[in-house]
UniProtKB/Swiss-Prot annotation:
Gene3D superfamilies from the UniProt entry: 2.40.50.100
InterPro entries referenced in this protein's UniProt entry, alphabetically: 2-oxoA_DH_lipoyl-BS, Biotin_lipoyl, GCV_H, GCV_H/Fam206, GCV_H_sub, Single_hybrid_motif
Cellular component aspect of the GO annotation: cytosol; glycine cleavage complex
Gene this protein is translated from: gcvH
Protein name: Glycine cleavage system H protein
Cofactor(s) listed: (R)-lipoate
PANTHER family: GLYCINE CLEAVAGE SYSTEM H PROTEIN, GLYCINE CLEAVAGE SYSTEM H PROTEIN-RELATED
Taxonomic source organism: Nitratidesulfovibrio vulgaris (strain ATCC 29579 / DSM 644 / CCUG 34227 / NCIMB 8303 / VKM B-1760 / Hildenborough) (Desulfovibrio vulgaris)
Entry similarity comment: Belongs to the GcvH family.
Domain named Lipoyl-binding: residues: 22-104
Binding note for cofactor: Binds 1 lipoyl cofactor covalently.
Subunit structure: The glycine cleavage system is composed of four proteins: P, T, L and H.
N6-lipoyllysine modification, residue list: 63
Highest taxon listed in the record's lineage: Bacteria
Length: 127
């Protein structure tokens, strides 16, 4: 399973790529694998404000529906509009084409996991 070392992760299986004072957010390979083929992605709008651990949207798949939680606080400055008509991008390419949001950070993110710690979390949940 792919767990890119350059990213940070949340305990609720979102990935975060920090780019200066912005962050790009999506769900991890493990999360999309557990959900199965996505059929719908509901995301906040540009200009919405997120707080850490606040529900920020949801995804629906052939297996289940699941909430998405904000791993960082800030203002949504971009949304991946392609997911509205092609939610399968999250399954096909969770770390690149399947990104979900770009956020202007309100503060330096805390309590995020590095790739090693996230790998340990996934291993503990997979059993």
């Amino acid at each position: 399973m792919s767990i890119p070392a350059e990213l940070k992760y949340s305990k609720t299986h979102e990935w975060i790529r920090i780019e200066g004072d912005e962050a790009v957010i999506g769900i991890t390979h493990f999360a999309q694998e557990q959900l199965g083929d996505l059929t719908f992605v509901d995301l906040p709008g540009v200009g919405d404000t997120l707080d850490v651990e606040q529900e920020m949207g949801s995804v629906e798949s052939v297996k289940a529906a699941s909430e998405l939680y904000a791993p960082v606080a800030g203002e949504v400055i971009a949304v991946n509009d392609a997911l509205a008509s092609a939610p399968e991008l999250v399954n096909q390419s969770p770390y690149t084409e399947g990104w979900m949001l770009r956020v202007k950070l309100a503060a330096t993110p805390e309590d995020l996991l590095d790739a090693t710690a996230y790998g340990e979390l996934v291993a503990s949940e997979a059993h």
